């Protein structure tokens, strides 16, 4: 954790996911006109509407009263089913391209898979009735994936999804014309040129002026903890040491580490704490990637 006044309202959290797969199973192809896009996984609800923009706006102590619905509801069992499905060699080779449903929901997850698309929002599986076209298009409900497959492979892919007890529905088709079309209740509610989407509607240019770094304002000469620099200038080494220890950024992270199980999957090579008494912080992360034989 990094402690700084700028993170009082919103924390900065950074995570990473790594995986490995045999090269023969990783297919990277273009989406061709006529290809079918299948939505599989969890159903779509109102949770997550506006989450992408909500994470970038100013929040206060009253935000929870109006922004609670922006937080997606997780569905771990369905996520596990998707993982099992994608680990099957015969399934991964059918997928030409795929995308996860992060920020923007259907409009982005499917909208990024090809230049020309026609999406039928009425086919999107719903958690409950009453969702309008906008909600179906932007909901960021989790545990969903969009995959592009050849028309001849649609039934085969749907069969594999059924074997994993996953809902899978063809919801879009790749078109020749570079336009994103979203249909709802038989009518287009979005019909935009790809060129417009790629440029945000305008040709953009910018001029940049970079100042020559100043020796007097050298960032690397500044102390992260100002009190340390002040004490050192006074020649008070002990005071500088105490000032540094008083900063939260040098405190032990053991309490945070203990909130997570580092032994899950039996893949950890070096645990977060090691040494004779298991109290010495490990300065790196080393783990085995889970692969099938």
Task: Kindly give the residue locations of the regions a language model identified.
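Glycine/proline-enriched, intrinsically flexible loops and inter-domain linkers
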Residues: 1-293
């Amino acid at each position: 954790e990094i402690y700084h006044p700028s993170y009082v309202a919103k924390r900065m959290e950074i995570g990473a996911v790594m995986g490995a797969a045999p090269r023969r199973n990783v297919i990277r192809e273009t989406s061709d006109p006529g290809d079918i896009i299948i939505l599989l996984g969890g159903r779509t609800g109102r949770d997550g509407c506006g989450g992408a923009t909500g994470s970038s706006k100013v929040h206060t102590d009253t935000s929870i009263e109006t922004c609670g619905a922006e937080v997606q509801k997780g569905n771990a069992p369905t996520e596990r089913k998707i993982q099992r499905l994608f680990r099957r060699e015969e399934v991964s080779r059918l997928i030409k391209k795929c995308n996860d449903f992060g920020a923007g929901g259907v409009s982005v997850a499917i909208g990024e898979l090809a230049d020309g698309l026609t999406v039928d929002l009425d086919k999107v599986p719903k958690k409950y009735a009453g969702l309008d076209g906008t909600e179906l298009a932007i909901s960021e409900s989790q545990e969903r994936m969009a995959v592009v497959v050849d028309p001849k492979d649609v039934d085969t892919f749907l069969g594999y999804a059924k074997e994993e007890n996953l809902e899978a529905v063809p919801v879009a088709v790749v078109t020749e014309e570079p336009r994103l079309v979203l249909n709802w209740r038989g009518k287009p509610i979005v019909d935009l040129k790809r060129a417009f989407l790629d440029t945000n509607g305008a040709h953009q240019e910018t001029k940049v002026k970079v100042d020559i770094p100043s020796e007097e304002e050298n960032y690397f000469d500044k102390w992260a903890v100002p009190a340390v620099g002040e004490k050192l200038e006074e020649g008070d080494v002990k005071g500088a040491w105490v000032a540094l220890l008083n900063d939260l950024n040098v405190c032990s992270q053991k309490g945070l580490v203990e909130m997570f199980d580092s032994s899950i999957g039996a893949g950890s090579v070096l645990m977060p704490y090691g040494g004779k008494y298991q109290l010495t912080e490990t300065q790196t992360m080393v783990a085995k990637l889970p692969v099938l034989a």
